[in-house]
């Protein structure tokens, strides 16, 4: 199991991107959360198997139909939080 901290930049707020991220996380059996940040980016914490996280990242980089992803920063964190499911945080 791994945990990634992901920051997504572009047109990713107000376009259903967090819902898209949650659906992709569920599809890949990941746990964690996604939230909007004050600077216009979206932050994601995702835990799961390495291959599942890689597939999830591919989907995130592609984006949802109404989003336009311009940059994705990924950092593997040292800790696991043991999330039970994947949530949208407000």
UniProtKB/Swiss-Prot annotation:
Recorded superkingdom: Bacteria
A single GO molecular function term of this UniProt record: acylphosphatase activity
Enzyme class: hydrolase
Domain Acylphosphatase-like residue range list: 3-90
Keyword list, A-Z: Hydrolase
Gene3D superfamilies (alphabetical): 3.30.70.100
Enzyme Commission (EC) number: 3.6.1.7
Enzymatic reactions: an acyl phosphate + H2O = a carboxylate + phosphate + H(+)
Active site per database record: 18, 36
SUPFAM superfamilies associated with the record: Acylphosphatase/BLUF domain-like
Annotated NCBIfam families: PRK14420.1
Similarity comment text for this entry: Belongs to the acylphosphatase family.
Protein name: Acylphosphatase
């Amino acid at each position: 199991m791994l945990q990634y901290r992901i920051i997504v930049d572009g047109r990713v707020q107000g376009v259903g991107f967090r819902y898209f991220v949650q659906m992709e996380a569920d599809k890949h059996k990941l746990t964690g959360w996604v939230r909007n940040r004050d600077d216009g980016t979206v932050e994601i914490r995702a835990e799961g198997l390495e291959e599942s996280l890689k597939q999830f990242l591919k989907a995130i980089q592609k984006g949802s139909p109404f989003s336009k992803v311009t940059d994705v920063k990924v950092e593997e964190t040292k800790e696991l939080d043991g999330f039970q499911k994947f949530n949208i945080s407000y």
